[in-house]
């Protein structure tokens, strides 16, 4: 990678990879005028000009940008937000999504929780699955056998699904910020250990279950049921979401990048 970058001689290098090594960033600084890292908590992050760490808690790192202010929300969400009519009074439809791949199959864990709860089985679920999800046949068979009210959406943009959901059950990734932008109260489950470092859910008071690989199913059932049953809690969350500075992340990032000395 370094030899290719040297041949290009760019004015800026943006690293969208995790845990960059210090040596790599030092070498980049010899080549490029500006080095920007994304979601980097490795040793190299301290040497970059800017680190866009929206998903992590602010730890005071001098060159890092934290929080929803710097999260770039895709245009599709901006286009679909006008269709949001959030009513905290009733819950009818629950959106479930754990990314495009869900390698740990947290989706099936949540479906088993729903199937084992007479209360949760009464609701309708929109299950958003990505192109790399490998357990579609298992999901289809399970939902049919257990007579779950599930509408499976394959490769469907979440921006078009969130306006029609009353609550969501989501992985603890950038989707949490997208749900916040769409004013969608959500139950959050970390799909792996690294996602446990993402703490934005605390700021808006989204119910959090923990690491999906470790938590008991009872915790998931409790958190989902709590959000469905407590309309005051949902209204409280929506109020928190309405007060966020979110949606202009690209403009804020551009402003920060322009301050990097040449």
Locate the predicted segments by residue.
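C-terminal alpha-helical cap of glycosyltransferases
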Residues: 246-262
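Catalytic binding pocket for nucleotide-activated donors in carbohydrate/polymer assembly enzymes
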Residues: 176-222
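Active-site and donor-binding regions of nucleotide-sugar-utilizing enzymes
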Residues: 1-64
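Acidic donor-binding loop of glycosyltransferase active sites
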Residues: 163-175
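Donor-nucleotide binding loops and adjacent catalytic segments primarily
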Residues: 89-165
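Short, charged/polar "capping" segments at the starts of alpha-helices
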Residues: 22, 44, 59-60, 103-105, ...
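A short, well-ordered alpha-helix in the C-terminal region of glycosyltransferases
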Residues: 226, 233-247
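A nucleotide-sugar donor-handling region in carbohydrate enzymes
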Residues: 47-105, 136
